[in-house]
C-alpha cells in the first residue's frame, strides 16, 4: 500500500458539474470542444484548448457589450441596437482593427465631416 492520498473509495454519484462552471465561464466549453473536434482543425484537441477559447470569446463579447451599452446610454436608449454595436466597435481603436473587414447590418456609418468642408473661422481682430 502506498502512502499517497486519503485512501478509500472515490466518490460516485456526485452532482455533475459542467466544464464551463468549473472554469467560471458563461460560454459553453463542451460545445466549443465538440466544434473544435468536428471542424478538422487538428487530429486531436487538448483539454485546455476549448476552455481558453471560451474565455477569449467571453471576454470579447463582454467588451463589445459594455461599449455598446455605453453607446446606447449616451443616446438615451435602454435597448442595444445594431447602430450602438457599430458605434462601439468603430470608436474603439483595437476592436476596429480586429473587425476591420466586418460589416454590421443596420449599423450605419460614423459621423465624420472633413475639416476642409467646415466653415472658415473669421477671426477679425477689431481695434
Swiss-Prot record:
Transmembrane segments: none annotated. PROSITE patterns: HISTONE_H2A (PS00046). Residues 1-23 are annotated as: Disordered. GO terms for biological process: defense response to Gram-negative bacterium; DNA repair; heterochromatin formation; innate immune response; regulation of DNA-templated transcription. The modification Phosphoserine is found at residue 2. The modification N-acetylserine is found at residue 2. The keyword DNA-binding applies. Its main location: nucleus. The modification N5-methylglutamine is found at residue 106. GO terms for molecular function: DNA binding; protein heterodimerization activity; structural constituent of chromatin. Pfam families: Histone, Histone_H2A_C. The keyword Acetylation applies. Residues 1-20 have a biased composition (Basic residues). Monoubiquitination of Lys-121 gives a specific tag for epigenetic transcriptional repression. Phosphorylation on Ser-2 is enhanced during mitosis. Phosphorylation on Ser-2 directly represses transcription. It is found in: Nucleus; Chromosome. GO terms for cellular component: nucleosome; nucleus. The nucleosome is a histone octamer containing two molecules each of H2A, H2B, H3 and H4 assembled in one H3-H4 heterotetramer and two H2A-H2B heterodimers. The octamer wraps approximately 147 bp of DNA. Belongs to the histone H2A family. This is Histone H2A. It comes from Caenorhabditis elegans.
